[in-house]
Structures are given as structure tokens and as C-alpha cells.
Regions:
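Conserved coupling/switch loop of ABC ATPases
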Residues: 110, 168, 186
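Domain-scale signature associated with acetyltransferase and cell-envelope carbohydrate enzymes
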Residues: 1-129, 155-157, 164, 174, ...
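Conserved hydrophobic/aromatic beta-strand scaffold that supports enzyme active sites
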Residues: 183-185, 193, 201
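A generic "structured core" feature
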Residues: 159, 173, 177-179, 183, ...
Length: 215
């Protein structure tokens, strides 16, 4: 190995170590915890909760409540309304309970009411919203049509798999499981496993045993 090659490899290795250390330090000091100034801008922010670094887009956080012991992963977006400083008709708009884990890159987009219970875990890149565009006028681009809101509730103890989508009007009972990639709308009782596009119940716990739903 020539001296120039050795020096180039040494510099590259040293830079790599420096970048990794900087990333580690940034991840540590960039956390938003209950005692941080930014946490005070939320409607409430429970003890032991944290928003990991780097955070995604966050605005109108005064309408967002986060319980205790909840971990929000990196790049998670938490937004209320169409833009910062919009005054909302309901408060809170987004409520995340105690001891939840929101996976990396997930989006919680609230306009009316999103209630996420306690002890809920999501995989990465889950999308939860209570608003969608209408499609009544075929001559108007869908993105320009009036929006419609419908409350979302996710029952305590539920698990949402990676890349699933929770649409307006969804009402999940306690301890439900949503399969990865499912697109969910509608009501599902406690202890139901839902999967598919559109999602449907594939297992439910009734009379002391797991059953495949009829129909």
C-alpha cells in the first residue's frame, strides 16, 4: 500500500468515526423530554416521555397531549390543522396515552379528534389521520375538493404494524392487532386482528377462544 493510499484510508476512517460520534451526540442532546422548553408548548407532555431526534414536522402542538412514559421515534410528524397557528374547534385534537411507542417515520395528522389510548405500539411509517378529501365533483381535482373529518379512536393495548394506514372514522377496540400495510376504516371490537386493503377482521376472540369471523 502506498503512503498516499494509507493516508487517504486513515482520513476516511477518522472522518467516519467523527460523523458517527456527532450523530450519537446529536441523538442524545436533540431529544425533547418533559423538562425541555419545547415540551412546554404541548397541551400536556407527561413525565418520562420523549420525542427522539431528529423530530419530524411538528406544529400546533398546543392541541396535542402526550401521556407519561411515551416514546415517539425519530422522524415522526405530529401536526394539527392545515398549518401552524391555525385555531382549532376542538382541544385536544390529538391525544396519545401513557406508555405508548410511536415508530420511526410515522405520521399523526389531526384536524378534529384522534384518541390513541394507553400501551399502544406502532411499527415504523404508520399513518393516522382524521381527515380526507371528498370526491363528489368529478370535474374538480381531488386535492381541491372539500375535506371531511371523522374522529379516530385506537383502543388501549393495540398494536399497529408497519406501514398501515388508519383512516377517518376508524374505531379500534382494546388490544387489537393491525397487520402491516393494512388500510383501516370502520369499527372493530376488542381483541380483533385486522388485515388487508381495505382491512377486514380475520381473527376475533369470542367465548374464550380465537375464531375466524363469519362472512
Amino acid at each position: 500500500m502506498t503512503f498516499s493510499r494509507w493516508l487517504s484510508d486513515l482520513v476516511r476512517s477518522s472522518l467516519g468515526v467523527g460523523v458517527r460520534r456527532l450523530r450519537s451526540v446529536s441523538a442524545t442532546i436533540g431529544v425533547i423530554g418533559a423538562d425541555s422548553r419545547l415540551a412546554q408548548s404541548f397541551g400536556s407532555f407527561g413525565r418520562g416521555s420523549a420525542l427522539l431526534f431528529p423530530q419530524g414536522v411538528i406544529y400546533n402542538e398546543k392541541y396535542i397531549r402526550i401521556g407519561s412514559g411515551t416514546l415517539v421515534g425519530p422522524d415522526v410528524c405530529l401536526t394539527v390543522g392545515m398549518g401552524p397557528s391555525q385555531e382549532m374547534l376542538t382541544n385536544p385534537v390529538v391525544s396519545i396515552g401513557d406508555r405508548c411507542v410511536i415508530g420511526r417515520g410515522s405520521h399523526v395528522i389531526g384536524h378534529w379528534s384522534i384518541l390513541i389510548g394507553d400501551d399502544i405500539q406502532t411499527g415504523p411509517y404508520v399513518y393516522i389521520t382524521d381527515q380526507n378529501h371528498g370526491y363528489e365533483d368529478l370535474d374538480v381535482p381531488v386535492g381541491l375538493q372539500p375535506t371531511k373529518e371523522a374522529s379516530v379512536r385506537i383502543g388501549s393495548g393495540s398494536w399497529l404494524g408497519a406501514n398501515c394506514v388508519i383512516l377517518p372514522g376508524t374505531d379500534l377496540g382494546r388490544c387489537c392487532v393491525v397487520a402491516a400495510g393494512a388500510v383501516v376504516r370502520g369499527s372493530f371490537p376488542d381483541h380483533t386482528v385486522v388485515a388487508g386493503v381495505p382491512a377486514r377482521a380475520i381473527r376475533e376472540f369470542k367465548d374464550g377462544e380465537w375464531r375466524r369471523p363469519k362472512g
